Amino acid sequence: MATELDKIFLILAIAEFIISMLGNVFIGLVNCSEGIKNQKVFSADFILTCLAISTIGQLLVILFDSFLVGLASHLYTTYRLGKTVIMLWHMTNHLTTWLATCLSIFYFFKIAHFPHSLFLWLRWRMNGMIVMLLILSLFLLIFDSLVLEIFIDISLNIIDKSNLTLYLDESKTLYDKLSILKTLLSLTSFIPFSLFLTSLLFLFLSLVRHTRNLKLSSLGSRDSSTEAHRRAMKMVMSFLFLFIVHFFSLQVANWIFFMLWNNKCIKFVMLALNAFPSCHSFILILGNSKLQQTAVRLLWHLRNYTKTPNPLPL
């Protein structure tokens, strides 16, 4: 029987799902149609499309996971179901995180301006570097999956009531193993987080410096450029804030989920964890002129369609 808290959790989870699906499906359709029409795919559009597809997959897993937690949390102790859901969530989250990291690095080298020779050298090799990062992410995904499989096996044994004797006899050994495995998972997730954080912070600093230079110039024609840079800074900080919330929620989830799997607070951790895949698509739409213009045209057509009176039947 679902409690009032479970109902609130499910309503918020469904709202996050619908909002994010609209944004990511829109990004995927616009970029695919543009690629087919132009017979050419740009690097940013390719990464954006892959990010949208991986996020859609993650959202489907999140929705199923939310219903499982909200309506039948006891099924998490079912070995095959619990393991399958956790592994699918981890794989889709891994791909989404790394693609978002590659996108932030791409925008950093594309937009930022630094005279340092290392920056110029890396910018010249930007496409190759992103390919290498994606290959690295696949190797880390394999490693993480192996570690996570062992982690799940031990954790499900601990929370399974049928293994109470095992839990009492070997609890210290099992918790020591879990601590090591959780540390490994945290370290591998810290790699994309550090790259994401570094690239966006340097991009923000570059935008701040460029905006300051525009303010110091007395040219009135620079006002629109200054405003554009201010909007870009706000979007960068919003994207960064969402990713930081996602990262720290992931660390909290790794450390407490299997210990407090039936606790009500885990539901709020899940909502915070899902904020990044649920909201980042709209930040990307606002930050991309092509997507923004297409969205404005779509909203304008929808507005006109709803205002058009239907003909009366004869």
Curated annotation (Swiss-Prot):
Entry keyword set: G-protein coupled receptor, Glycoprotein, Membrane, Receptor, Sensory transduction, Taste, Transducer, Transmembrane, Transmembrane helix
Does the keyword Nucleus feature in the UniProt annotation? no
Give the matching InterPro entries.
GPCR_Rhodpsn_7TM, TAS2R
Might you name a Gene Ontology BP term for this protein?
sensory perception of taste
Q: Where in the cell is it found?
A: Membrane
Which residues are exposed on the Extracellular face of the membrane?
1-7, 72-101, 149-187, 260-265
> What stretches pass through the bilayer?
8-28, 51-71, 102-122, 128-148, 188-208, 239-259, 266-286
Q: Which residues are glycosylated?
A: N163
Question: Which GO molecular function, any one, fits this protein according to its record?
Answer: G protein-coupled receptor activity
Indicate whether Glycoprotein appears among the record's keywords. Answer: yes
Any Pfam family from its record, for instance, is TAS2R
Query: Which SUPFAM superfamilies does this chain map to?
Result: Family A G protein-coupled receptor-like
Q: Name one GO cellular component term.
A: membrane
| Main localization, broad class | membrane
Q: Spell out which residues lie on the membrane's Cytoplasmic side.
A: 29-50, 123-127, 209-238, 287-314
Membrane topology designation: Multi-pass membrane protein
State the family named in the UniProt similarity comment for this chain.
Answer: Belongs to the G-protein coupled receptor T2R family.
Q: What else is known?
A: Most taste cells may be activated by a limited number of bitter compounds; individual taste cells can discriminate among bitter stimuli.
Main function:
Receptor that may play a role in the perception of bitterness and is gustducin-linked. May play a role in sensing the chemical composition of the gastrointestinal content. The activity of this receptor may stimulate alpha gustducin, mediate PLC-beta-2 activation and lead to the gating of TRPM5.
- Tell me what this protein is called: Taste receptor type 2 member 42
